[in-house]
Structures are given as C-alpha cells and as structure tokens.
Amino acid sequence: MAAGQQSGEFSFKITSQIFTPGPANSVLVQVNFEGTASGYGTVLGTDTVVVGKSGPYSGCSACYLDNGEITTYTSRGTYESSGRHKWRLQEVGQFSNGRTVDVEGEVDLAARTWNGKFVERS
C-alpha cells in the first residue's frame, strides 16, 4: 500500500455470485457485496473477477453516506491466493467526489467476507 496514514477500514459481506463464460475458456464471477466503510456509510457493489488463484479484477459501487448524499466508486486491482479459499486483494479506486484511494483487503470464501483498509492518495 502507498505510504500514508490509514484513512479507514471496510467490512463487507458477500451476498451473491454470478458465474459467466469469459474469454479464452475462462470463467468470470460477478461478486455482489454490501457493508460499511469508514466515512462512506453503507456500501453496495459488484466486483468482476476472472476465477483463479490470481489475476485482475474491476469493481464499482455506490456509497450511501450518513448525510444522505450518494458517492460512486470505481476500481481496478489484482488478487492472489493467501490460503485455502482466501485471497489477498489490492486495488486503486476513484470516488465520484475526486478522491483516490489505495486499498488492501482479504476475501474469505468460507465466511463470505471481504475486509480491509484504505489510504487516501495525496
């Protein structure tokens, strides 16, 4: 993760997964999640991943802030296996308010969770 102070944490629950054929005999999974992120209230989103032990992914979400505002978020990142049915993820994301963050987290398939932290870029 880029140098800087931790801006916040997130805790997401995976709510569903949709599998579709991908390029070159790959399989894509759309992972839907919901939860909370520090300073961004309730978050609902979807990441699209090429199924495997490592690879790229992209995502988009909507953040429903406590003050009633809505902020959107898009990201691109990579993942790699970090244990049995666990994956470590790193991404760079852009909020519609102009803020850019570096994100690190871990997905746990058994628990159906994605938890991590983010740091705002200066």
What is each residue range found by the language model?
Residues 1-122:
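Beta-strand-enriched cores of mature, soluble protein domains
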